[in-house]
């Protein structure tokens, strides 16, 4: 079985911690993964994998995390044809209700526009926010985590989502 490549960026450590938990859980389930901090990785490295997990928190007012922002131009030019990816991100649905999880949308939409298949959608119903670029009907384009207001739900959400994407990846 081919490995899954996980690429993430983090300023405060929340996204890094979630990525580490997710990797540990997936590997405990027999899924082989490689993990990359996007701060130290050329985005073209993603093209070496057929399956990706991409993690990015929403930063400031609806912006990408610093390292993702730095490579975003190059990311948007990649051809993701034949690649399947799941997205997850941290946000604050109370303090930033008008742009909750926007980073998932900022990364997920160009991924699909450039030929990629997006999996791992997550229902919006458990969240209280006003607007999100990650929203697609009654789903987000990926898993939303809110350690600022619902930290007690983070591990449970990660486990449920990991089981979902394992099935969707076919692993």
State what each model feature region is.
Residues 4-25:
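N-terminal beta1-alpha1 ligand-phosphate binding loop
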Residues 30-42:
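A short beta-strand-loop structural module common to alpha/beta enzyme folds
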């Amino acid at each position: 079985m081919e490995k899954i490549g996980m690429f993430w960026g983090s300023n405060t450590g929340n996204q890094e911690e979630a990525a580490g938990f997710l990797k540990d859980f997936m590997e405990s389930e027999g899924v082989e993964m490689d993990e990359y901090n996007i701060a130290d990785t050329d985005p073209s490295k993603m093209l070496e994998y057929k399956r990706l997990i991409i993690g990015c928190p929403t930063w400031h007012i609806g912006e990408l995390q610093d390292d993702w922002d730095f490579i975003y131009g190059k990311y948007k030019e990649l051809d993701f044809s034949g690649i399947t990816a799941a997205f997850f991100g941290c946000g604050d649905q109370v303090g930033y209700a008008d742009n909750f999880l926007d980073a998932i949308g900022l990364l997920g939409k160009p991924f699909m526009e450039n030929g990629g298949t997006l999996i791992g959608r997550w229902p919006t119903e458990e969240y209280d926010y006003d607007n999100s670029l990650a929203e697609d009907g009654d789903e987000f384009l990926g898993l939303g985590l809110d350690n600022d207001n619902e930290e007690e739900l983070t591990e449970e959400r990660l486990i449920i989502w990991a089981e979902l994407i394992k099935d969707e990846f076919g692993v």
